[in-house]
UniProtKB/Swiss-Prot annotation:
This is Superoxide dismutase [Cu-Zn], chloroplastic. It catalyses: 2 superoxide + 2 H(+) = H2O2 + O2. It comes from Vitis vinifera. Disulfide bonds join C115-C204. Binds 1 copper ion per subunit. Binds 1 zinc ion per subunit. Zn(2+) binds at H121, H129, H138, D141. Homotetramer.
């Protein structure tokens, strides 16, 4: 009841007084309402907390291609890439004749006409054929894999021109193993600068993303 009486008799005017600036790091704001005093300090106003720093998490991408052909040649190729780093290609192909065999990434993942419909080597930069370590090469030039006496070729290839994402991603394209050795563009044959004179296409498989 005392509070109600006080408010009902209080004048309608409100007087605010501000102290002179002082070195006090917590200045106060005084408000007088007919005998009532309210003090505000900077500490009484909650401040927004600073955002937490962002953490960068490595992104791993993986893909696989299952190679099949009209002969007994078959195999599995897995590809993996960390962030924007090089792509690691793990190859295991069986049924080959012993020796070197050209191994390339081709432009299309179209196998409606077998390996012949996979197109030419993947070549987004318009280069001539070369070795994987050459500056001038097709992006799809992965060199040779070597089959042992049992016809099994196992290899690990690390390459920077066959990413699993981005405008030149290899997803949906095809890996092809060839009949002959790739001359890496240095054989002097009329096909050296286009196919490496690697002969027929023994088996192929479309590159597709796989769960990590």
């Amino acid at each position: 009841m005392a509070v109600n009486t006080l408010l009902s008799t209080a004048p309608s005017r409100v007087f605010l007084s501000f102290p002179n600036p002082s070195p006090n790091p917590s200045p106060q704001l005084h408000s007088q309402f007919h005998g009532l005093s309210l003090k505000l300090t900077r500490q009484s106003i909650p401040l927004a907390t600073a955002p937490k720093p962002l953490s960068v998490v490595a992104v791993t991408k993986k893909a696989v291609a299952v190679l099949k052909g009209t002969s007994s040649v078959e195999g599995v190729v897995t590809l993996s890439q960390e962030d924007d780093g090089p792509t690691t290609v793990s190859v295991r192909i069986t049924g080959l004749t012993p020796g070197n065999h050209g191994f390339h990434l081709h432009e299309f993942g179209d196998t409606t006409n077998g390996c012949m419909s996979t197109g030419a080597h993947f070549n987004p930069n318009g280069m001539t054929h070369g070795a994987p370590e050459d500056d001038v090469r097709h992006a799809g030039d992965l060199g040779n894999i070597i089959a042992n006496a049992e016809g099994v070729a196992e290899a690990t290839i690390v390459d920077t021109q066959i990413p699993l994402s981005g405008p030149n991603a290899v997803i949906g394209r095809a890996l092809v193993v060839h009949e002959l050795e790739d001359d890496l563009g240095k054989g002097g044959h009329e096909l050296s600068l286009t196919t490496g004179n690697a002969g027929g296409r023994l088996a192929c498989g479309v590159v597709g993303l796989t769960p990590i």
